[in-house]
């Protein structure tokens, strides 16, 4: 993450959410952090408490995210790739299983405000859910996913190519930001 380059607007990225069972999307790994419909503002969850992650006692001078911390809303520049090796990352889940028994759903988020761009993705102070994807053969959480999408006023795609074409990150913008 090199020099600070101001951009106007937002960046898009792919990310996973967990379906809550109550028409809510939760951050799947540092949770349960609920994403609201519309704008969400990140806070630093740098402290681990007895009952989960807690807000940091000392806010970062420049706000969330900080380059010296792991805070902020995360998203990937590209679709998660499967990797069966020992160095597998937690987000490397088969996209075809989105909305399946594990309760995770793939989507696209917009990030804006303070955004740190990395080689594989970004972290942002503000985030918004834009669209969701359910694997074409998935039937487990279909009703719940539809109710959740309606609550967030976002579309649900069953065709991965159409989902990426319509909502995926702008490749030209990414090339400039990661150069």
What are these regions (language model features)?
Residues 92-130, 134:
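Charge-dense polyanion-binding interfaces
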């Amino acid at each position: 993450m090199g020099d600070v380059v101001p951009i106007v607007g937002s960046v898009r990225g792919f990310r996973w959410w967990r379906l809550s069972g109550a028409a809510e999307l939760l951050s799947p790994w540092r949770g349960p952090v609920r994403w609201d419909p519309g704008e969400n503002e990140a806070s630093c969850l740098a402290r681990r408490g007895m009952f989960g992650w807690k807000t940091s006692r000392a806010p970062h001078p420049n706000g969330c995210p900080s380059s010296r911390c792991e805070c902020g809303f995360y998203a990937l520049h590209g679709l998660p790739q499967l990797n069966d090796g020992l160095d597998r990352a937690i987000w490397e889940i088969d996209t075809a299983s989105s909305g399946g028994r594990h309760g995770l759903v793939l989507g696209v988020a917009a990030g804006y405000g303070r955004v740190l761009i990395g080689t594989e993705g970004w972290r942002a102070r503000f985030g918004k859910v834009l669209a969701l994807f359910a694997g074409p053969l998935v039937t487990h959480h279909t009703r719940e996913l539809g109710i959740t999408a309606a609550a967030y006023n976002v579309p649900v795609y069953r065709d991965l190519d159409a989902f990426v074409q319509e909502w995926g990150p702008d490749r030209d913008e990414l090339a400039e930001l990661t150069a």
